Amino acid sequence: MVRLAPAEGLISVDDHVIEPPTVWVDRAARADRDRVPHVVEEDGVSVWRYGDKRITLPSLFAQAGRDEADIMPGLMSYSDMRPAYFDAAARTEDMDTDGIVASLCFPTIPRYCGQTFLEAKDRELALECVKAYNDWTIDEWAGGAPGRFIPLIITPLWDPALAAAEVERCAGRGAKAVSFSENPAKLGLPSLHHRAGYWDPLLSTINDTGLPICIHFGSSSMVPTTADDAPIFVSALLSPLNLTYAAADWLFSRKLERFPNLKICLSEGGIGWMPYIIERAEYVVEHMRWARTFEPFDYDNTRYENLGPAVPPSDLFRRHIYGCFIDDRFGVENLDAIGADHVMMESDYPHGDGTFPNSLANAERLLAGVDAGARHQIMQGNARRVFRLEEPQWASSKTS
């Protein structure tokens, strides 16, 4: 195991934690312990029970440290898992091996932006579950290894006022980022374009706190495919493109103009598509000027409303949107068209797309032709700025 000095390693802005079995039970009133998410063992498999949900843990969610030849679809119990999947101290040991100095982790049982609790029938209990998860990720996951984890919180998406209050509460307790859906409309919620400003209470609070918004592909609970009988490779190929849709929504929602401190981090979407989207957005605005003043497909010219962005989309993109990637050679080769100051890296631990135990080596390989200043920005400087991270206080040492 090699312990790196902070300046020598990589900050990963997209990893994952499989919550320990006691996260919600430990924080629930005794009468509610069988109503909050809890684990039961069924035929050698750990099953999370919550309301009418039965949530299992596919082995494909957790492949770090396993030989490729041993990876097959199946279900896991906690006894099968590498402790680093759910234990902070063990995770930091794997991070040291991997060259990761700090890590932002998305949840598993709540799903990427808290969809599990959005779908719950008992909203009062669901709110308590959201708060319990956030307290755990701040106090125990991040608190168990100060400086090593970037606390990412979820919100009660069904009520923007409650969500805003939870962001404010958690910001005061040390949260560093807020998870949000790539497309809330697919979750049965209003879109970013909602004319009455459904999301404004939440976005206003995020704007005021300065917390970045992290959006992971799959956070709309929608898996893209072309046909019911298309092979899984089609969905795997297309999934990152969900974030191109998210970028389009943010660019044309007017939210980035109304809330100028927003920072949108697109997790696991890669960066190679960004130059085209920036160029295409400019082209669309230039060649569809009529759309600035008319409702879509409404040609009654007595109804005027400025629907177009007041700021060029390319400027909005470069001010507010950050690309995150694991392995994107084309994107790195086109950094000049994106901006090295708006790109961050991921290890995706412990998922199958991840690079453990070679994340640092992977980054150094990809960035070998990038100048030293930009390389440092991408490997950790941008993350320190966006998430307002202090330098870790742990000392550098190397052991074998």
Task: List each language-model region with its residue ranges.
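Mid-to-C-terminal alpha-helical segments outside catalytic/metal-binding sites
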Residues: 1-11, 19-74, 79-97, 101-102, ...
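Histidine-centered catalytic micro-motifs
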Residues: 11-18, 213-218
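Conserved residues at the C-terminal ends of beta-strands
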Residues: 13, 19, 106, 181
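Substrate-binding cleft and catalytic face of glycoside hydrolase catalytic domains
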Residues: 105-119, 144-148, 163
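Short glycine-enriched loops at secondary-structure junctions
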Residues: 106-111, 217-222, 349-352
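Short glycine/proline- and charge-enriched loop/turn segments
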Residues: 117-122, 228-238, 359-364
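Catalytic pocket-lining loop regions of alpha/beta-barrel enzymes
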Residues: 125-126, 142, 147-150, 155, ...
